[in-house]
């Protein structure tokens, strides 16, 4: 029971992942052909009204069907398509092929080239990797090495957002990242301490393209500690604190807003009971900018050109309820609130998701 409690608590506290979106381990079933279905129907209404970011609504769905072939116990090949549509457009806003080859060292460690497992599964913090990328940029392309265990999670990847050819007039865009979490051995019967470390490098440039913009490279890091105590007899109920330090740097020292170095701190109280979680926190930053982050936390305006509010102070709160059904379907309701103490404005976001994921065996190719 103690072993089960530790394992469950680690995943409940650290992941927030959809059961439907987790990567299935199927490489042990050699010479089989599978159909993998991944679907997310979403509504996210951002009621923002401040100089940094204006309100907008994301509503739509994506469908990502894939055919997976397992030629060997450790090798799998996947081919499919990612289809993204926003409601009211009457069309697909994004249609892209997905293809990957994966080598599995074990049931918890793999190396992949091609389409990665999904942007939300990096388990990154919202201020430097916007959780809305789950809707807008789910299917990343590049290479990835991931390993996880009872006490740790490590995801190292490189994703290519924009490829350039000789003579192009645009920049190549790529992101390299590391997401690491470690659950310390218990120092008290009811106390659990986790240490997260996250790193992102975002590059805009390229040598063979003829573009007007300058080469830019940004480094964002997050390091913190999360401590929780058992809040009841249930192994998936906890309460605790989390403190995370963020830094943002322009490695090329040429940020368009003259912000070449910034920092932030996020201090939160949290509570978890089964499928529900509640957080209350305080965010303070100085010249903080993350290219892929949620602009609600940023010092740089996404709304008005050249506007920078160097010092930001926010009181934050969130509620999340996730209801799974038979490990293939999940319903999620989430609320996020932000009160800017300097601007004296309250902004909020409401999210509704229904996510479906299913792996279906369609044929056995093994010779009899």
Model-derived regions: residue spans:
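Short, glycine/acidic-rich beta->alpha junctions
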Residues: 59, 91-93, 137, 172, ...
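Surface-exposed coil loops of outer-membrane beta-barrel proteins
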Residues: 110-181
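Exposed, low-structure sequence patches enriched in small/polar residues
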Residues: 60, 80, 98, 149-157, ...
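Flexible, solvent-exposed loop segments that connect beta-strands
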Residues: 48-52, 126-127, 295-303
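Short acidic/His/Gly/Ser-rich catalytic and metal-binding motifs that mark active-site loops
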Residues: 44-45, 120-124, 206
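Sec-dependent N-terminal signal peptides
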Residues: 2-17
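Beta-barrel outer-membrane channel/assembly domains of diderm bacteria
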Residues: 19-104, 349-354, 365-367
